[in-house]
A protein has these predicted regions:
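Gram-negative outer-membrane beta-barrel transporters
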Residues: 460, 472, 568-572, 590-676, ...
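Membrane-embedded beta-barrel scaffold of Gram-negative outer-membrane proteins
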Residues: 257, 346, 350, 356-362, ...
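Short acidic/polar hinge/loop motifs at secondary-structure boundaries
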Residues: 57, 177-203
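C-terminal beta-signal and adjacent terminal beta-strands/loops
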Residues: 675-677, 698-759
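Short, acidic, small-residue-rich periplasmic hinge/interaction motif at the N-terminus
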Residues: 26, 38-42, 67-71, 81-125, ...
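Structural signature of Gram-negative outer-membrane beta-barrels, strongest in the C-terminal barrel
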Residues: 300-301, 398-404, 408-410, 441-573, ...
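N-terminal periplasmic accessory domains that precede
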Residues: 82-87, 132-135, 154-155, 170-173, ...
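Transmembrane beta-barrel wall of Gram-negative outer-membrane proteins
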Residues: 231, 238-267, 272-310, 335-350, ...
Length: 759
């Protein structure tokens, strides 16, 4: 009996033993330490808060609760003395969410001085998880057109809408790796959505640290594995028009290292003729904590893509048979075949509580073989770069000062060759046939960025943000094909461009926060745009320059049940680049005008009280776009006062989310897009249209380790005929009508299942 009592006493004492623990608490999506995070010991009720580096230490009896505004509360079991890394998952309430201020100075979104939108993992997974445009188009001020899965164009506040092909004038990054090439063009639609934990969009030229593109900055945050967590998942889905998708993901997290590998396979037969799509992607992220002062992280991704190009249609073909390909593009069986890889390694060194250094080495390669009716393009590109910055924190007479200082070097080595396409010399069905060489250009497209940014907190109400950015871009073109009698060789060094910004954030009360900023931005011409028709550099070409003026308010009421923001802005752009085509594949640019981008953006979110049945969330956002040509003369035509081409006058999104206590969930999104000018003369407009998308599903945890998610969804439920992308200012060659319109998908459905196993 005495032995039994003794054993009982020992066990009782052990169950209440105190453990000396320490650690750091970080954001699960950004890996940024969380300041002022609350840790409570359940038994003793003792509590402690993390410091500015997210660190803490205290005595615990067995179990702690970790909480912070904007994050899901987490419970952690303690059974020994140890150093912990604890990850918190951001909640939907975006005003409280921690963000990386353009990946430079961590700050809560409500205290940002610019208009910034955050798309978290739950919102990324809201649709079919293969298309990016439904995700971005729910953000006020952002409009992504999508001709096919491999042909897209993103505009932010009207900037980028007049680009002929793809996305330009917007800086994009995957982690710390630039997705924007030396020509200022970006292709983010090829990145696997399942590899993303977060998308951060800064509207306007307000990101000093990551370039000051006129439109703004898009930061794609890769999914990083939690330490001491291992899991595996498999997803498969099918949909209309031969859509098939498989995603496999394995993660392994130890005490000091983590590893995440994701593979995806995507296929679509396509809605149109010559519209097949195949993409395979492998994405790897890894991290190592060598000690308390140094961490290393790796991001790598390889993409193999082959997709048909049906191209745009004229009005008659769009109205009568939108599923056809443009005749010459279908006859030549045009396609693009891309191999694309990116790699980045980041070193994080903490010198002290006040100073931290972040240094990244990155590189990429891109090979593309692209037969078109007018020629066959074969191109290779290799990039290499380095970014380094130091983050400092100080307190000066009770005033909090945080600063960021650094630079970036970027080298882009490009080779593009074109060949005759002899498809017309062969029977229909043969497709493209490579002929004689037409051109061979080797290009070096390099730049450097120097940047500085600081946040000054004068008191709990008033904050200032100051930023400086210096850029210089260099082009070097070597023409390796002189048989055509044209030598396009030459160098073109743009003058250094200095871009300042100033921002302010003022807390009126617990419900209202004012913000505003003035920022300078620019966009350089591409190498093609700098060449005149005779093949020589245009010495008079200049970058587009703009100043953005903005003010807004962020609000929350009814205990955070209602929250949102309103922004008013004007962006004045001068030296507008106007593209002129001489033949189907030959165009150049001149500086020919000014534009005014005046707009209002509003967002309202409502979260209902959680009941035994579940919870409902509502949202509405709208963009009112008053974009015009201030001064614009092209040849003999004066377009001054016309509406800016390629941008709708208004966009509205309405949505509802249901999260049931019975494990069911559902969402519905309605989007209304106003009419869009298709040419600079404003003589052709794309009709307004409405889209209704929805998804329902069931997810449940089975025996603790297994989680299953089954869903079905539909896009364009109302089956509205619409043009999902426009070829602005199209010209009809050979007496043919201009081909302005890319048909959007009619009603289509998808469904799938995801199985997740967690150790």
């Amino acid at each position: 009996m005495k032995k039994i009592i003794l054993i009982f006493l020992i066990l009782s004492l052990n169950s209440y033993s105190q453990y000396n623990i320490s650690g750091v608490i970080v954001d699960n999506t950004t890996m940024i330490p969380i300041e002022n995070c609350k840790i409570i010991d359940i038994l003793s009720k003792a509590e402690v808060y993390t410091d500015s580096n997210g660190s803490f230490s205290f005595m615990s009896n067995n179990k702690i609760i970790v909480s912070s505004p904007g994050y899901e509360t987490k419970e952690v079991i303690i059974n020994r003395d140890e150093h912990l890394t604890i990850y918190l998952i951001p909640t939907i309430n975006k005003l409280e969410e921690i963000l990386v201020k353009a990946a430079s100075i961590p700050i809560e979104q409500k205290h940002a001085t610019d208009a910034v939108s955050i798309i978290n993992k739950k919102e990324i997974d809201r649709g079919n998880t293969i298309e990016l445009h439904p995700i971005l188009n729910k953000v006020a001020g952002v409009f992504m057109q999508h001709a096919t899965l491999n042909t897209n164009r993103i505009a932010i506040r009207g900037i980028g809408a007049r680009n002929l092909f793809g996305t330009a004038n917007i800086r994009t990054y995957f982690g710390d790796i630039p997705l924007t090439d030396g020509n200022g063009e970006s292709s983010i639609e090829d990145i696997e959505l399942a590899s993303l934990s977060k998308i951060e969009i800064h509207k306007g030229p307000s990101s000093s640290t990551y370039g000051v593109g006129l439109g703004g900055t898009i930061l794609l945050k890769p999914t990083l594995t939690n330490y001491q967590e291992s899991r595996a998942s498999l997803s498969t889905s099918v949909g209309s028009y031969g859509l098939r998708r498989t995603v496999a993901n394995v993660t392994k997290g130890g005490k000091k290292s983590n590893f995440n590998i994701l593979y995806s396979n995507n296929h679509s037969d396509g809605y149109r003729v010559n519209n097949t799509y195949d993409r395979n992607t492998v994405t790897i992220t890894a991290g190592v904590d060598t000690d308390n002062m140094n961490t290393f992280s790796i991001i790598a991704s390889y993409i193999n893509l082959k997709a048909g190009i049906p191209s745009s249609l004229n009005q008659e073909d769009f109205d009568t048979n939108p599923r056809q390909a443009a005749f010459t593009w279908g006859r030549s069986q045009a396609f693009e075949d891309i191999d694309y890889g990116i790699l980045g390694i980041t070193w994080n060194h903490q010198y002290s509580d006040k100073y931290t250094q972040y240094t990244s080495l990155f590189g990429s390669f891109r090979n593309n073989y692209e037969p078109r009716p007018f020629n066959i393009l074969s191109e290779r590109s290799n990039t290499l770069g380095i970014r380094s910055r130091i983050l400092g924190k100080h307190t000066i007479h009770t005033k909090e000062l945080t600063w960021n200082l650094g630079g970036e070097l970027f080298f882009d080595f490009y080779n593009g060759r074109t060949f005759d396409n002899l498809y017309q010399d062969f029977p229909p069905g043969t497709g493209s046939v490579q002929g004689n060489q037409l051109s061979d250009l080797q290009e070096k497209r390099n730049y450097y960025n120097l940047f500085a940014e600081t946040n000054l907190k004068l008191n709990n109400k008033l904050r200032f943000n100051l930023g400086l950015h210096l850029n210089q871009t260099f082009f070097d073109v070597n023409d390796q094909f002189l048989q055509d009698g044209i030598n396009s060789s030459g160098t073109f060094d743009f003058n250094p461009i200095f871009s300042p910004k100033i921002g302010i954030n003022y807390v009126i009360n617990s419900n209202l926060i004012l913000f505003g900023n003035i920022a300078h931005g620019f966009s350089t011409p591409t190498t093609t745009e700098t060449l005149l028709p005779e093949g020589v550099f245009n010495p008079d070409i200049k970058p587009e320059i703009g100043w953005n003026y903005e003010t807004g308010v962020r609000y929350k009421f009814l205990k955070n049940k209602i929250y949102g923001s309103i922004s008013l802005y004007t962006l004045r752009v001068r030296d507008l680049l106007v593209t002129r085509r001489t033949v189907e594949d030959n165009f150049f640019a001149i500086n020919a005008g000014k534009t005014n981008h005046n707009g209002i953006e509003g967002e309202i979110n409502y979260t209902s009280t959680k009941t035994n049945y579940g919870q409902l969330n509502f949202y509405i956002n709208t963009s009112l776009n008053m974009y015009t040509f201030d001064e614009f003369t092209d040849l003999e035509a004066d377009f001054s006062g016309n509406n800016l081409t390629g941008v709708p006058k208004n966009i509205m999104n309405l949505g509802i989310d249901l999260i049931s206590e019975k494990k069911f969930y559902a969402n519905l999104n309605f989007q209304a897009v106003g009419e869009i000018p298709v040419n600079d003369a404003n003589t052709v407009f794309n009709d307004p249209y409405e889209l209704l998308n929805g998804k329902i599903g069931y997810q449940n945890t089975i025996k603790k380790h297994w989680k299953c998610n089954v869903y079905i969804g539909a896009n364009n439920i109302l089956d509205k005929k619409h043009a999902s992308q426009l070829q602005i200012n199209a010209i009809g060659f050979g007496g043919n009508a201009p081909r302005y319109f890319y048909p959007g998908l009619p009603f289509n459905i998808y469904g799938g299942i995801n199985i997740n196993y967690r150790l």
